[in-house]
Amino acid sequence: MSPPGSAAGESAGGGGGGGGSGVPEEPMASADEGPAREEQRPIQPSFTKSLCRESHWKCLLLSLLMYGCLGAVAWCHVTTVTRLTFSSAYQGNSLMYHDSPCSNGYVYIPLAFLLMLYAVYLVECWHCQARHELQHRVDVSSVQERVGRMQQATPCIWWKAISYHYVRRTRQVTRYRNGDAYTTTQVYHERVNTHVAEAEFDYARCGVRDVSKTLVGLEGAPATRLRFTKCFSFASVEAENAYLCQRARFFAENEGLDDYMEAREGMHLKNVDFREFMVAFPDPARPPWYACSSAFWAAALLTLSWPLRVLAEYRTAYAHYHVEKLFGLEGPGSASSVGGGLSPSDELLPPLTHRLPRVNTVDSTELEWHIRSNQQLVPSYSEVLLMDLVELGSRCGGPGGSYVPRCRYGGVGGPGAAGVTPHWRSCEHCQRAVSSSSIFSRSALSICASPRAAQGPGASAGCGGSRFSLSRLYGSRRSCLWRSRSGSVNEASCPTEQTRLSSQASMRDNEEDEDEEEAGPPPPYQDALCFPVLIVHRQEGCLGHSHRSLHRHGSCVETSL
């Protein structure tokens, strides 16, 4: 995803006030407070560019057809042909004379086409865009004032979701066949809207400012055609992710309410009467002659509308002005907060609202890239099982470079650890590694290990290659134990790893005894094995062991690694 993405906003469809975005209604800061704006001047097009931009091909086609009909009528009146006739009045003699080729009524055919095309031509002149643009004539000063209001206006990015379904209905219609009327039943489907939801983009945390250009040079042209477009962009990835996250959350909440959902979105400027097209004149009371309505209709009646439009396009300057709002300037990642930390207003807010986590708003493309490269994301449970912790154990000071986990009671996770003085290792990375939670639910795995099983060979097998981590102790009276018998990676043969879950009775039935036990000294290592959950990591060097057996409430489940 490209960091500053931009999207054009629609001007129709209604604003979304139902979302309760909490965006302040005050106007934005003026242009003088921010950095210097880039200037934009109207463009004076050439003749070829004016034709390419707006060719008025409908008017041109109708004009050419009418000129062709007029040419046909003129040809009928000017051209003469020699005719030879035989009549009995002249006693069988032939008569030669010169006459028009359309004397037998053929002249009415081009006249009929001419009248029909002329009517269509006048309708096209009435509905053409050039005539509508002449109705929005404004002076240069009012244009500058309107541009200033749009720059200071508060933007509102809205979303609208319409849930609907189709209902099958019938109605009686009358049809005619061979002059006979008969009634039949017609089946049709009618759309029924069941739910309409609206929301706005809450940009209170990321901030917004106007980055539109300064429009200058309107006084230099006799007429300037202006087109205004609303758009918005993002200055940081966090702001864009906040927008995408809110947008996706809104449409996800309204997606399953009915069979179908119509999604609409756009942006409007609050308290601003937005107009897309305008024509600015230095003096609107005395516009150029080609920009007058009287000249336009006079040329239309004389079938000269297309030449007048081309002349007006050539003599009129053109400017496409973008009202652009930039989001993402007041967040923690902006330039204002890089050097000075958080502002006093930011310190009053909850810490989770300071920054939107990247992993919570990552899109599908970037998520796939993170999964492939295994970077910047917390590894999954299966990935943790395959991690090599030998290097981690050497950094944490294990004996012989091996990884020695420690339980929360202070005992060392190895055979003969009951005599070791209870203490916590100061290595933060080691503590963080051994305090991972189990992926299985404790309600689903309410099977405890018996004391006899804890004293078996599985609990005392202290292979150097055995790797496990201790999860935190839960408050329930039942706990789960993962016991493993695995050989070292350096050995010639690695025995089969058997992972079992055995049930254990409740440690204490009296809550007072539990409180006294927790307040007392740490229990021995063999007793401590019954409390935490041991997540046994399968050896990477063991070949041929691709399945493990899970005994859950007496049933065996084979899971493939």
Curated annotation (Swiss-Prot):
The annotated regions of Gly residues compositional bias extend over 11-22
Q: What segments bear the compositional bias annotation Low complexity?
A: 1-10
Is Metal-binding among this UniProt entry's keywords?
Answer: no
Keyword Membrane found: yes
Q: Which UniProt keywords apply?
A: Membrane, Transmembrane, Transmembrane helix
**Whose protein is this, by species?**
Mus musculus
Spell out the protein name for this chain. Answer: Transmembrane protein 151B
Q: Which family does it belong to?
A: Belongs to the TMEM151 family.
Q: Where does the record place Acidic residues bias?
A: 510-519
Q: Outline the segment boundaries, as ranges, of region: Disordered.
A: 1-42, 489-523
Q: Where in the cell is it found?
A: Membrane
**Which regions are flagged for Polar residues bias?**
489-507
Q: Which residues cross the membrane?
A: 59-79, 106-126
* Family matches, as InterPro entries: Tmem151
Q: One Pfam family of this protein, by short name?
A: TMEM151
Q: How does it sit in the membrane?
A: Multi-pass membrane protein
Cite a GO CC annotation. membrane
